[in-house]
UniProtKB/Swiss-Prot annotation:
Disulfide bonds: none
InterPro entries associated with the record: Ankyrin_rpt (IPR002110), Ankyrin_rpt-contain_sf (IPR036770), NF-kappa-B_inhibitor (IPR051070)
GO molecular function: DNA-binding transcription factor binding; histone deacetylase binding; protein-macromolecule adaptor activity; transcription coactivator activity; transcription corepressor activity
Originating organism: Homo sapiens (Human)
Feature: compositional bias, Polar residues: 365-381
UniProt-recorded name of the protein: B-cell lymphoma 3 protein
Entry-annotated residues carrying Phosphoserine: 41, 374, 402, 406
Lineage summary: Eukaryota, Metazoa, Chordata, Craniata, Vertebrata
Amino acid sequence: MPRCPAGAMDEGPVDLRTRPKAAGLPGAALPLRKRPLRAPSPEPAAPRGAAGLVVPLDPLRGGCDLPAVPGPPHGLARPEALYYPGALLPLYPTRAMGSPFPLVNLPTPLYPMMCPMEHPLSADIAMATRADEDGDTPLHIAVVQGNLPAVHRLVNLFQQGGRELDIYNNLRQTPLHLAVITTLPSVVRLLVTAGASPMALDRHGQTAAHLACEHRSPTCLRALLDSAAPGTLDLEARNYDGLTALHVAVNTECQETVQLLLERGADIDAVDIKSGRSPLIHAVENNSLSMVQLLLQHGANVNAQMYSGSSALHSASGRGLLPLVRTLVRSGADSSLKNCHNDTPLMVARSRRVIDILRGKATRPASTSQPDPSPDRSANTSPESSSRLSSNGLLSASPSSSPSQSPPRDPPGFPMAPPNFFLPSPSPPAFLPFAGVLRGPGRPVPPSPAPGGS
């Protein structure tokens, strides 16, 4: 009796999403019958011993040395490549076959007890819907291997037997989930057209659209959106983390999937359930300038607030993300918006450059050359500059003078009078109330007498 291969007994359910890949050939960590298809390599000649040529035993054939039955049964293109590379048996046993079925490893005398041989279609349907120790049906395995003819045949068997295509394995994955994870858009289109539900949830509450965005596969997402019947695909469905497919696409920073979701009507301001963050706030917290610009170009609300009242500008200012702060301010972000702690983006900012941008100082372009003074510029003097000039005595102190009027010029040929700040300041008149104000901690100083008095 042949022995089981090493590691075959202690192999548990295979997590195709989180299990690390083996260092060898692709799919080497999977069971033999679930590995992806590859071109068969020529087998080396067996060494000759004292007893002659030694024929190696195949553990999946049960030690039988009979050749496989030639010819594809029921239109299957290449059934021997259905489960692993090399010559295998047909999809279901026949009378001319003397070896066990490759999926269940039952000898031929026991198989007619399960499926009568006079109903080959019933045998096909029974074996196509039978799950192994991992909960995988032959349809799961054919999808993982990317065997499109076998997927066609098995889908037809499911439909003829009245079975649903949404069969979960032990990891709560349907064949459609596996088709999206392995990025096979043709298989995705085939399964959805045949009746697979695009809203089936995996163990994380994710639909096929979530998985397509998570694995950065815009081709699978497009195939899913094109082949789904109207009203059967909800793009606003949340997973167990409260995220929509658009949130997942923004977090993976795949602009093609984001663009595709927005074109198909996904809500650009949808908030997650846990924190109330919009996709724009997620993009800001990921420090993705290109994603922020893409969302703003499609009309995202720049002042959207999460449950704590903070906006995208709060997040960018508190993290010191200078390019994002500048982009949000130019897009109309409100710097006076307060969160639940009564903090504005200016109050949570820690960087001096961010503070300057929020105050409007760093956004003004710096002038490289100073223009020559002209009468027009002197006529448009600001009130602050006119007040500084009047305090220095450069402008007339008469009440009738206004800041918009320039000071009178001296006639030609006469020198300009010296400014007032070169002359001693006159003493205040006696009738002003502040004439006797204290100048120090001592006594009040009496007003000085008027000039010319005794």
